[in-house]
Amino acid sequence: MDIYQHRRHNKNLLMVHLIFVTKYRKKIVLGDFRDAVKQYLFNTCVKNHWYVKRMETDQDPVHILLQYNPTDSITHIVSILKQHSTYLSWQQHSALLEQHYWKKHVLWSDNYFAASIGTVSQAVIERYIENQG
């Protein structure tokens, strides 16, 4: 099985480990909301041709290991993931979010962590992400 993405003029394997935290580090990514947030993030990745290798949450942080295209910047990926998941979360779970975020339609902190990874360390990062939550 070839793990590389084949394009007309390139062959690549670009992967990044992303971590988002909720605004004010609120511990709200639980239960049904946790599953919904993961689904929103996954669907956004599929729509943009990013491939989720692993994703897990632990009340507040969300860890995602994804493979992306060389035409996409990490900043762009993070922005799209946060925007779409926030919008959908407020549409579907406004009662929950209004308890924590008064008058502001926010979900994520402005900050994020991103680390590019090589294939040598992928298994280690996957185990780490699987053990979250």
Provide a role label for each language-model segment.
Residues M1-G133:
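Basic nucleic-acid-binding interfaces
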